[in-house]
Amino acid sequence: ADLKGLDLSGLNLDKANLISAILTGANLKGISLVGANLFSVKAMRADFSGANLSGANLLKANLTRTKLQESNFNDADMTGINLSDADMRKTDLTRAKLVEANLPGVDLTGADLSEAKLTGRYQREGYFSRGANLKKGVLVGAKMQGADASGTDMVETDCTDVDFTNANLSEANFKHARLKSTCFVNTKLGDADFRGANVIDCDFSGAELIEAKFQGVDLSSVKNISAEELQSSQIDSETKIPDYIEVNWTSEDTYE
């Protein structure tokens, strides 16, 4: 169906079949699409502000540069979706499936991604693909408690005030990310890469840091990082350690 540029605001299209529909530039403000099938839909630059898409199927949909503020994607399947440069401020993505999602430049300020899944997946060829791409995104104040975001790409992403409590971020890439007052309480961060990241006032209480890469990172202001976990991570003589942990360097890359 070609619905390009149409005004569909406020309509109830629950459980509608819109497979491969063209919604480019359409006005879908406040629309209800609960449980709808939007597989492979093209909705670039459309306005979904305040829309309800809970439980919808958005596999491989293209929502580049869409407006999605305060919309509801509870339990939606968004595997392989393209949300590049989308405005998703205050969006509810609780338990949403964002496997292999492409979200570079997305604005998720104040969004709720509790228990969302942002991982890669096993391909037929037998290899595991990378997690969601959130490169250069804005996640200020987002809730990501219990989210599975292993392997997620957060290079240069702004994660100020994000709550990652109990999340799985193993192998996540935080290179050059902004991590100010970010909460990593009980977070799995094994093999995560923090090199070049701006890490200020973050809480690492109970975080798992095996092989996490902190070479050259300033950790002087972080809270509750345990000496034991830090020892299991990768640091070097350029890493700035908090005052409450004592490290004696015996050579450039060994310490006691």
Predicted regions and their residues:
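Tandem repeat scaffolds
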Residues: 1-256
